[in-house]
UniProtKB/Swiss-Prot annotation:
This is Diaminopimelate decarboxylase. Specifically catalyzes the decarboxylation of meso-diaminopimelate (meso-DAP) to L-lysine. It comes from Corynebacterium glutamicum (strain ATCC 13032 / DSM 20300 / JCM 1318 / BCRC 11384 / CCUG 27702 / LMG 3730 / NBRC 12168 / NCIMB 10025 / NRRL B-2784 / 534). The modification N6-(pyridoxal phosphate)lysine is found at residue 75. Induction: Up-regulated by arginine and repressed by lysine. Keywords: Amino-acid biosynthesis, Decarboxylase, Lyase, Lysine biosynthesis, Pyridoxal phosphate. PANTHER family: DIAMINOPIMELATE DECARBOXYLASE, GROUP IV DECARBOXYLASE. CDD domains: PLPDE_III_DapDC. The active site is at 374 (proton donor). GO terms for biological process: lysine biosynthetic process via diaminopimelate. Pyridoxal 5'-phosphate binds at residues 257, 299-302, 404.
Amino acid sequence: MATVENFNELPAHVWPRNAVRQEDGVVTVAGVPLPDLAEEYGTPLFVVDEDDFRSRCRDMATAFGGPGNVHYASKAFLTKTIARWVDEEGLALDIASINELGIALAAGFPASRITAHGNNKGVEFLRALVQNGVGHVVLDSAQELELLDYVAAGEGKIQDVLIRVKPGIEAHTHEFIATSHEDQKFGFSLASGSAFEAAKAANNAENLNLVGLHCHVGSQVFDAEGFKLAAERVLGLYSQIHSELGVALPELDLGGGYGIAYTAAEEPLNVAEVASDLLTAVGKMAAELGIDAPTVLVEPGRAIAGPSTVTIYEVGTTKDVHVDDDKTRRYIAVDGGMSDNIRPALYGSEYDARVVSRFAEGDPVSTRIVGSHCESGDILINDEIYPSDITSGDFLALAATGAYCYAMSSRYNAFTRPAVVSVRAGSSRLMLRRETLDDILSLEA
């Protein structure tokens, strides 16, 4: 049952590790009061706990046998600052566009520790990857395989590659972010034999060096068995490649997808336990197949960036809406919405929100938190119990917004993208400035 105390708690498995509510009710992250940040930088505002982000990088590195085995999935959230943090923690980086590559290189990230993804890379992207000495390219189609071989030959280089495999696992996740079943755009089918044919073609290509296979069962996955089943199926292909082609592939990239908690009712996947079980299982399976166990690589993005960040909004209007004869819902409008967080509208995602400028002490009421866009689906929190005293001028924060929020943001209704700041040891630093109308108008021809 919702209580006044619940409204003011900050669930540790949802909020940044350095988030604290003070005796006066104000929430701080890394010692910095969130209302002060809102006043200084404006709202909406993304606030990244740098030490939280870095500590999750280290947790992943420890779990999977070293930082070089962990590739931060930059699609979750990437800036030059983020790329530098990832570099300083020793992790590798995976990118999925030519501009993500550009951001990483602009930050000074070593190209040799970059892995490139994408189902439709094209000549320009492939050439940039080869010219800059990117460590791995994950091949997604036969056409791309031939094109990369051609591009690498033109540059006089041998490019290390992995083959993306669809092992046919139906991950327990949203349809749009499940990536390992058959009827979707990514990779080569294991069941049809096209994955083996791709591996054979890559092995025979003069300017490609096949170093491993890649698979990704989906995002926001909480069933660890899916990872082990995918590994088992893909290792069967390793055995086939070894026996028929005489090649021992040294790497197995199992992607990311480790689920995090967005609400107090959810529990994040225990990555340390999953990693231990997965690495043990891979070693055992490889031994049973009579092959050397490949080095396991992983690609967490959300599990690192997501919990490290909150988004601060200022509350605007509130209204009570009669839902039926015996129910009223409180609508709370904030100064952002689907332009800075499309996930609730796109995936039906849920979030945890708290007043961060004071203690909330009102009675529990059914509440819907909405944005300011001209769209009825502009909803951040659909139907939860919140205090009745949330009012105009309050600062409200959503937790776990570090992944796929700014990265998927838009200028819908000509809203400008929010600023992003990092906090550490009682101080803040601007990572990305807030966009302005001049930024929008600058694109006009």
